[in-house]
C-alpha cells in the first residue's frame, strides 16, 4: 500500500518541461504556420519579380500561362515538401532521437531562409521554388516530430494540454505572418524578401537553446536502452527525484512490446493488433484536411468583399480571423484535459458540419437576400472556431497516444503522409470544384465533416488520463486480439492499476 503514493502522484508543469515545450513549438511548429501564410500577402509582388527576372534574362515578359504555372509550382512545393518530410520522420527519429531530429530539421529552415532572403538580389525565382520545397520538408518533419516529442516528455495528466501547444504555435505563426505581411509593413516591393527570410529566427533560437533540454525518456529507455539517461531526463522534467513509478510504467510498455522491435509502415498495416489505430489516424488526419479548412480560407476574402468590406481592408479582417484561430486554440489547450479529446473532436467536427451547411445556403441566397453575406461571415468565423477546438489540434495528439513506442514513428509517417496529400489535393481540386458547383462546393465538406463525426462517435475512445499501455489495452478489445502484439500475452496480464502515474 505504501508504494501507491508515488504511483498516484500527478505530474506538474515544471520550468524545464515548460521551456522545452515552448522552444520545440516555437522553433518548429511556429515556422510551419509562418511559412503557410508568408507568401499570401506578397503574392502579386512576387509574381512581378518572376516576370521582371524572366525579362532580364530573355528580353521578353513571361506569358500569363507560364507565370501562373510558375506560381502554382512555388505554392505547391510547400505541401509536396511536407509530404517528403513526413516520409523522413521514421528513419530520423529512430536514428537521431526526437530532440536530435528537431535540431537537424533546422537545416531545412535556415538554408531556405537565406535563399529566399537573397533571391531578389540574385534575380532567381528558382531559389524561391527550391526554398519552398525545403521549408515544406521542415514543416513535414516538425508537424510530426514536435507532437511526438512533447507527448513523450509529458506526464499523462498534462499530455493533452501540451499536445495542443504545437497547433497553437502553428496558428500563432500564421497570425504573425499575416501581421508582418500587411501592406503597411513588409508586403512591399523591398520588404517581401525580408518577410520570407524571417523564418530563420525561430530556427536559430531552437538550434541554440534546445540542446540544453532532455531527450524523450521513452526514446532513451525503450530504444537506446539507457536507463540512467532516461531516469535523469525524467528527474529534470518532473522536478523531483522519485520517478521510479514512471520508469516502471515505461518499462512495462517496453516489456509489453519487446518482441516487436521497431515496426515499419508495411508491418504496421499488416498487424491485426494495430488495425483500428491505423484506420483511425487515417480518417482523422484525412478528415482534418478534407473538412474544408483550406477552402474556407481560400473563399474567405470573397465572402468579406461580398459583405461590403473594402478591398484594402480585407487584410485586416483576415488578421482578425487569424486572431480568433489563436484564441480558440488557446481555449483548446485549457479544456482538453477537462473535456477530453473525443468530446473536442465531436464538438469541432459538428460545428464545422453546421457551418458548411449554413454557408452553402447563405452563398446560394446572397444575391437575393441583402443580409446573407453577413451570415456567411458568421459561418466562416464559426467554422474557424470549431476547427481550432478539435479537428486542428487533436489528431496529431492522438497519434502519440494510441500507438506504443515501437509503432509510433511509423504511425506519424502514415498520419503525416495523409495530412499533406489531403492538403495538396484540396489545394489542387477545390478551384475546379468551385467553378463546377459554385455556392454548393461546401456541401462536399459538410458530408466529410458528418462522416468523420459519426466515425469518432462510434470508434474513437477517450484517451484522457490514461497511460499509453492502457489506451492500447482498449484497442486490443476493438481489434479482437488478446495483446498489444501478436504472439505475446503481457498486456492482458498487466494490471491497469500497476501502470497508473
Swiss-Prot record:
Main location: membrane
UniProt: D-fructose binding residues: 32, 167, 288, 296-298, 387, 419-420
Swiss-Prot/TrEMBL keywords: Acetylation, Cell membrane, Glycoprotein, Membrane, Sugar transport, Transmembrane, Transmembrane helix, Transport
TM annotation in the entry: 19-39, 69-91, 99-119, 127-149, 162-182, 193-213, 278-298, 314-334, 343-363, 372-394, 413-433, 440-460
Glycosylation sites recorded in the entry for this protein: 51
GO biological process terms on file: cellular response to fructose stimulus; D-glucose import; dehydroascorbic acid transport; fructose import across plasma membrane; fructose transmembrane transport; regulation of systemic arterial blood pressure mediated by a chemical signal; response to fructose
PROSITE patterns given in the database record: MFS (PS50850), SUGAR_TRANSPORT_1 (PS00216), SUGAR_TRANSPORT_2 (PS00217)
Gene3D superfamilies from the UniProt entry: MFS general substrate transporter like domains
Matches recorded under InterPro entries: Fru_transpt_5, GLUT, MFS_dom, MFS_sugar_transport-like, MFS_trans_sf, Sugar/inositol_transpt, Sugar_transporter_CS
GO cellular component terms given for this protein: apical plasma membrane; plasma membrane; sarcolemma
Localization: Apical cell membrane; Cell membrane; Cell membrane, Sarcolemma
Keyword Nuclease: no
Extracellular topological intervals: 40-68, 120-126, 183-192, 299-313, 364-371, 434-439
Superkingdom in the source lineage: Eukaryota
Spans within the Cytoplasmic topological domain: 1-18, 92-98, 150-161, 214-277, 335-342, 395-412, 461-501
Known role: Functions as a fructose transporter that has only low activity with other monosaccharides. Can mediate the uptake of deoxyglucose, but with low efficiency. Essential for fructose uptake in the small intestine. Plays a role in the regulation of salt uptake and blood pressure in response to dietary fructose. Required for the development of high blood pressure in response to high dietary fructose intake.
PANTHER family assigned to the protein according to its UniProt record, in alphabetical order: SOLUTE CARRIER FAMILY 2, SOLUTE CARRIER FAMILY 2, FACILITATED GLUCOSE TRANSPORTER MEMBER 5
Name of the protein described by the UniProt record: Solute carrier family 2, facilitated glucose transporter member 5
Gene that specifies this protein: SLC2A5
